[in-house]
Regions:
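Catalytic machinery of carbohydrate-active enzymes
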Residues: 1-345
Length: 345
């Protein structure tokens, strides 16, 4: 049996879709499963034990005429695979078209698909309610296929070879590690850097044995520098300094992640690591940290969640600016922060 899953982006969305892969492989142990993914996120799935291969997709290149021959070769390859099942979890016109062009025997998607993608599907799976979490909605494609849904699976398999990198950075076994994620794709999903810095300073005072790591991409490096100054001798600005697999292992190793609504938040939820998630314009019941919604902080404003990437409230971005460091610290105080002595280094 051959199966193709289409979920090219983003990081958080791909993480939330991984349970579909895990349960398909458990049910169809001999199946060859392929994943269609954005080239930038391919390292997330490279070497995954449940995949027979990944199909790289580079949206910006394929939108240009000179790259059409490459696109046609990919389509030809997809057709040659003779997939028995194609599952489109991206549900946009592009992914729906590629799913249809793969000519699988059965094409399944989600019934809230945008841009007319539903027209490509043999079966469109409804969302149970507006507030149904993305993970549960993705998993809803499985029962119609005869695949049971349960939680007995490893979401993100460990990569022990990367643990040495953490040790090289100076975080020894048994040390308490607190990670902070100040960036986000939407500007209005970012808790202010000055708030992160103030929080880090308070945490450094309360936990003198703690080390701090600031996660993010290269563009977040200035934010990381601001935050690191709160405890300069105990902070590592990791923004732009880790690969995607390395970032995952840093989160696996941490005692606590303090994060905006972004990809690393979903990584921590998948790994079962303690987190505090700061939400503003988005709806945590739909896309919050799965299994840890009780650890979400957000303000109950008339406009929130607006689900918009730009703020139009009379007090700009008040949904996050109004969350004080003291409020976040109070939430953190409810955790019993213990060094993860059972975490391999």
């Amino acid at each position: 049996m051959k199966i193709l899953i289409l979920k090219p982006s983003s990081l958080g969305d791909v993480i939330q879709a991984l349970p579909v892969l895990r349960l398909l492989k458990q049910h169809y142990s001999a199946a060859e499963i392929f994943w269609w993914i954005d080239t930038a996120l391919a390292p997330l799935l490279e070497g995954d034990p449940d995949l027979a291969g990944i199909v790289r997709f580079e949206r910006r290149r394929w939108g240009k005429l000179q790259h059409w021959p490459e696109m046609l070769r990919s389509i030809r390859w997809l057709r040659e695979q003779n997939f028995d099942l194609v599952i489109d979890l991206q549900c946009l016109a592009r992914s729906g078209a590629f799913a249809w062009l793969a000519r699988g025997k059965l094409l399944v998607g989600l019934d809230e698909a945008r841009e007319g993608a539903c027209g490509f599907y043999d079966l469109a799976v409804p969302r149970a309610s507006f507030h149904t979490h993305a993970v549960d909605w993705y998993l809803a494609v499985l029962p119609p296929l005869g695949v049971p849904v349960h939680k007995d699976f490893i979401w993100l398999p460990e990569r022990p070879q990367l643990a040495a990198e953490i040790k090289r950075k100076g975080v020894a076994a048994g040390a308490r590690l607190i990670l902070l994620q100040p960036g986000a794709r939407w500007k209005n999903k970012r808790w202010p850097a000055k708030h992160f810095a103030a929080l880090a300073g308070r945490l450094a005072q309360k936990h003198p044995d703690a080390r701090f790591g600031i996660l993010g991409d290269r563009g977040d490096h200035p934010l990381g520098e601001v935050i690191a100054q709160a405890a300069p001798e105990r902070s590592l600005n990791l923004c732009g300094a880790t690969s995607l697999p390395e970032m995952i292992e840093w989160i696996r190793r941490c005692d606590l992640l303090i994060t905006n609504d972004t990809g690393p938040m979903h990584v921590a939820a998948a790994l079962g690591r303690p987190l505090v998630a700061l939400f503003g314009p988005t709806e945590p019941r739909r896309t919050g940290p799965y299994g840890q919604l009780q650890n979400v902080l957000h303000l109950d404003l008339p406009c929130s969640p607006c689900l918009k990437s730009e703020c139009h409230y009379e007090k700009p971005e008040e949904c996050l600016r109004g969350l004080s460091p003291a409020t976040v610290l109070g939430k953190i105080d409810t955790f019993r922060l213990k060094p993860p002595s059972d975490q391999p280094i």
